[in-house]
Amino acid sequence: MTKSELVEIIAQKQPQLSIKDVELAVKTIIEYMSQSLSQGQRIEIRGFGSFSLHYRAPRVGRNPKTGETVHLPAKYVPHFKPGKELRDEVNASLKAGY
């Protein structure tokens, strides 16, 4: 699902809201979540999951084109951990499809 598909679905389910309003709300939520993560904050949405940062230690990598070794610096990467309700819902719907 893309951001524009999400906006369309929400606008259809909430006909009292204009597409512009829904688009602004979705953009604002994503912007605020990105800002919070970039400040090192954890985001928890009960029933859905949590977003946090995971540390990746420096390591030696390899350029796939040239084969030369490259030193990769340490970094933080965003990480999503699904909540129990989301995991259960996904597993139940996938099992029903088999």
UniProtKB/Swiss-Prot annotation:
A GO MF label: structural constituent of chromatin
Cross-referenced InterPro entries: Hist_DNA-bd, Histone-like_DNA-bd_CS, IHF-like_DNA-bd_dom_sf, IHF_beta
SUPFAM superfamilies xref list: IHF-like DNA-binding proteins
Keywords of the record: DNA recombination, DNA-binding, Transcription, Transcription regulation, Translation regulation
Transcription among keywords: yes
Any one of the GO CC terms: cytosol
Coiled coil: none
GO biological process, one term: DNA recombination
PROSITE patterns noted in UniProt: HISTONE_LIKE
PANTHER family the record matches: DNA-BINDING PROTEIN HU, INTEGRATION HOST FACTOR SUBUNIT BETA
HAMAP family documented for this protein: IHF_beta (MF_00381)
Subunit description: Heterodimer of an alpha and a beta chain.
Function: This protein is one of the two subunits of integration host factor, a specific DNA-binding protein that functions in genetic recombination as well as in transcriptional and translational control.
Family: Belongs to the bacterial histone-like protein family.
Protein name as it appears in the record: Integration host factor subunit beta
